[in-house]
């Protein structure tokens, strides 16, 4: 007597080595014994399951932006609190390097972690990310027991940033693989509907800017109600909880964990082509990124303090500046990416970076430098303008990578776009660290200046000039391109 087993959809399906959803159909054999009668892939079930999985992965990546960037994007609020409520040994001026050091360490770690977790240690991504979450949380807890300024620098600027980098790199690599442009909705490769990796990155970048919009107010509330020690412990718990949740939601893609072509093919795929380092183009853009990043982190760190000390604004207004600084980045990243990658009027990478750099410099020199006591409107205008144009600078890297890929094709050379992107992030990290180290002597240089009518005449005058000049040099690639073209003509 035959019979059909009643099995749930979850039990009917599993995932094969390629990420394909496979449905098993069970039936009777006429003798009452159950066996597998057919084995088939079901496109509808496969696509539904894959879409659900990608939605959860995108949710996890979006959540991860809070623990990764929340502290660094709101550090200006902590910086202001440290200066106004200083009780630790050492100079409070040193706290100015924490925010830029945190960003620098995070970005500098990306090239190395990307190289390690791309293939060789891909199976250990979630473990590494969990270890990073634990390290970041522990660092913030240890920081709450600080008694000297260097304790803050070591825990918040270095250790916590390393932990955040360990969360960022593995999860971002997996996100890109699940939304690979050449992968079908079913999870395998083929000619089906392509997934939107760029859209996925755009959503997570938008969430990063959303974090930067509300975190300053959250940090302010925690500091005012509990003080920095309890606030750091609360943040450690929030960072750990959201990190673990995001890590659970972002598994490594199955195709990365298998080697269908054998050991030789796996070894070949691990080799990273470095031919692009022989050409001048990469170094031109890398230097430009370093210079632009050196000044980019300074407003994020010092704007709240500047608003309180120089323009005499309230704490709420000072915090609002950071929110206004981060919000425009949601739109700017998409716009600058579109300028260098559209079918109607595509602009070269040098042109787009020059637009971002020049407008950022003008905003700094003409708006920030000319603010005076009580000029909230002008500071808000600077925050929005600088945040838009400088915040969109990293979105120009897609055009930079396209140019390097075209150059590699011209020379018939292989190129790894992911590795180039990691190195560009590393250049950004060098800029962040350099800017943080330079900011302290610049503040000391302006320390003897009396508070004047405009920002240039204040203690922050040298910092304002440095930010403006570094922004200008962030677009020097267009000068190099014009010079090279002129040489060829002559």
Regions found by a protein language model. Give the residues of each.
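Helix-loop-helix hairpin linking two adjacent transmembrane segments in secondary transporters
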Residues: 197, 204-254
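Helix-to-loop junctions at the C-terminal end of transmembrane segments
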Residues: 109-123, 332-348, 367, 443
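Intracellular juxtamembrane helix-capping segments at the cytosolic ends
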Residues: 82, 164-187, 200, 392-411
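C-terminal transmembrane helical hairpin of 12-TM major facilitator-type secondary transporters
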Residues: 326, 346-400
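Hydrophobic core of transmembrane alpha-helices in multi-pass small-molecule transporters
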Residues: 62, 66, 136-140, 149-167, ...
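Conserved MFS/SLC helix-loop-helix module at the cytosolic interface between two early adjacent transmembrane helices
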Residues: 108-150
